[in-house]
């Protein structure tokens, strides 16, 4: 595990502020919205569809804390772009939007360095003000929308209206207290991690924040490599993974196979009270990966000689299957959902940090074993020579 302290020169202009929103392209946005609201504690924020004059695409916007998800679907059978995306990738993340300052400058610099500009800067406005946008191509079919608010005071963005329907079930469910996006992870095919991470360094002036390789993260069967990139202020963190050769197909390779290439593997959501959050998410019916009781037996032994003290009750962490990683300065608590669609692709993480800025490297081996158990149930913990071939295709 390597942590990098050199952030490079501070960009002259074009500051990246934070994650703005994540857009999912799904087959049925209305039903996907219901899942994230009922299972995960999101609430409707805004809507754009036929009733608001949007004739091609419907979008339901949901929010929890500072986390904003946009669930979008095609309205017409001739929408080839969204149709092809769904056939290839299934339901998943299409766009990660960043709120920025000086969108024009960022686009100009990215273009000079060779980035593919999917859509040049444009401005939209309504009675609440103006917003400038631009769209850049990153790994796979994923895009980044740059969002520059020009004194905009609306709830979301121009063109969206308040949702017409509020599900009466939602206020009766326990609060989940998820507060903000901590990081968003992209999986790459083998040998593409470095080029994908370098894209951010070159085009967006991000820097390397953290990395691990397959000598540090491996099981008997599989392994991974990961590089985390971040903006100068380190308010946006983007881990980039790739599979590493092993005896069996890794969970990263399984993702790449079923996603049809690179894409967003998971979104980590930060909380200040993970025990309450996970208890309530489990009560709502969200499914999580399980880890064996031996993990907690070993954890109790290791913590006896650790320089830090975990404030949370270890029995409660074991009951909820929450993982702990730590160093001499602090610790983090984390847990991962099972895939949130039928394809074994996108899943979510809930994380709580106590003076610890890592990504759970100490848990990677335990997690990989948990992932491998799930892979085995799906018939996908196969020999490496079958890599790249999705069963039945």
From Swiss-Prot:
Residues 18-149, 180-338 form the VOC domain. Its cofactor is Fe cation. Keywords: Acetylation, Cytoplasm, Dioxygenase, Disease variant, Endoplasmic reticulum, Golgi apparatus, Intellectual disability, Iron, Membrane, Metal-binding, Oxidoreductase, Phenylalanine catabolism, Phosphoprotein, Repeat, Tyrosine catabolism. One of its GO terms (molecular function) is metal ion binding. It is a peripheral membrane protein. Transmembrane segments: none annotated. GO terms for cellular component: cytosol; endoplasmic reticulum membrane; extracellular exosome; Golgi membrane. It comes from the Eukaryota. The modification Phosphoserine is found at residues 211, 226, 250. Its EC number is 1.13.11.27. Fe cation binds at residues 183, 266, 349. Its main location: cytoplasm. The modification N6-succinyllysine is found at residue 132. The modification N-acetylthreonine is found at residue 2. Binds 1 Fe cation per subunit. InterPro entries: 4OHPhenylPyrv_dOase, 4OHPhenylPyrv_dOase_C, 4OHPhenylPyrv_dOase_N, Glyas_Bleomycin-R_OHBP_Dase, Glyas_Fos-R_dOase_dom, VOC. Pfam families: Glyoxalase (PF00903). GO terms for biological process: L-phenylalanine catabolic process; tyrosine catabolic process. It is found in: Cytoplasm; Endoplasmic reticulum membrane; Golgi apparatus membrane. Pathway: Amino-acid degradation; L-phenylalanine degradation; acetoacetate and fumarate from L-phenylalanine: step 3/6. Homodimer. Belongs to the 4HPPD family. Catalyzes the conversion of 4-hydroxyphenylpyruvic acid to homogentisic acid, one of the steps in tyrosine catabolism. It is linked to Tyrosinemia 3: An inborn error of metabolism characterized by elevations of tyrosine in the blood and urine, seizures and mild intellectual disability. Hawkinsinuria: An inborn error of tyrosine metabolism characterized by failure to thrive, persistent metabolic acidosis, fine and sparse hair, and excretion of the unusual cyclic amino acid metabolite, hawkinsin, in the urine. This is 4-hydroxyphenylpyruvate dioxygenase. The lineage of its organism: Eukaryota, Metazoa, Chordata, Craniata, Vertebrata. The gene is HPD.
């Amino acid at each position: 595990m390597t942590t990098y302290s050199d952030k490079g020169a501070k960009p002259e202009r074009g500051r990246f502020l934070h994650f703005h929103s994540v857009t999912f392209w799904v087959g049925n946005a209305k039903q996907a919205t219901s899942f994230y609201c009922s299972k995960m504690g999101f609430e409707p924020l805004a809507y754009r569809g036929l009733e608001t004059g949007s004739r091609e695409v419907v979008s339901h916007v949901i929010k929890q804390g500072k986390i904003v998800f946009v669930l979008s679907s095609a309205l017409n059978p001739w929408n080839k772009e969204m149709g092809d995306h769904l056939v290839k990738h299934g339901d998943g993340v299409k766009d990660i939007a960043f709120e920025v300052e000086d969108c024009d400058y960022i686009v100009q610099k990215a273009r000079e360095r060779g980035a593919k500009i999917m859509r040049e800067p444009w401005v939209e406005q309504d009675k609440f003000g103006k917003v400038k946008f631009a769209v850049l191509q990153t790994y796979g079919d994923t895009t980044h929308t740059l969002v520059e608010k020009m004194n905009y005071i609306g709830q979301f963005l121009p063109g969206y209206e308040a949702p017409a329907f509020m599900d009466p079930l939602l206020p009766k469910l326990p609060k989940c207290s998820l507060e903000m996006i901590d990081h968003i992870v992209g999986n790459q095919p083998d040998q593409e991690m470095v080029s994908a991470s370098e894209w951010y360094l070159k085009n967006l002036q991000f820097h390397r924040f953290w990395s691990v390789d397959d000598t540090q993260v491996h099981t008997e069967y599989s392994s991974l490599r990961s590089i985390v990139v971040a903006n100068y202020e380190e308010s946006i963190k983007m881990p980039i993974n790739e599979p590493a050769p092993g005896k069996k197909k890794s969970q990263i390779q399984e993702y790449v196979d079923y996603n049809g290439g690179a894409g967003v593997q998971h979104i980590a959501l930060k909380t200040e009270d993970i025990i309450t959050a996970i208890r309530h998410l489990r009560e709502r019916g969200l499914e999580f990966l399980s880890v064996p009781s031996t993990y907690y037996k070993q954890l109790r032994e290791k913590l006896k000689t650790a320089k830090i003290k975990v404030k949370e009750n270890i029995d409660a962490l074991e009951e909820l299957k929450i993982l702990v990683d730590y160093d001499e300065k602090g610790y983090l608590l984390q847990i991962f959902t099972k895939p949130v669609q039928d394809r074994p692709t996108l899943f979510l993480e809930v994380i709580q940090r106590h003076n610890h800025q890592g990504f759970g490297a100490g848990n990677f081996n335990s997690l990989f074993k948990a992932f491998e158990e799930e892979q085995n149930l799906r018939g996908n913990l196969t020999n490496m020579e079958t890599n790249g071939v999705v069963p039945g295709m």
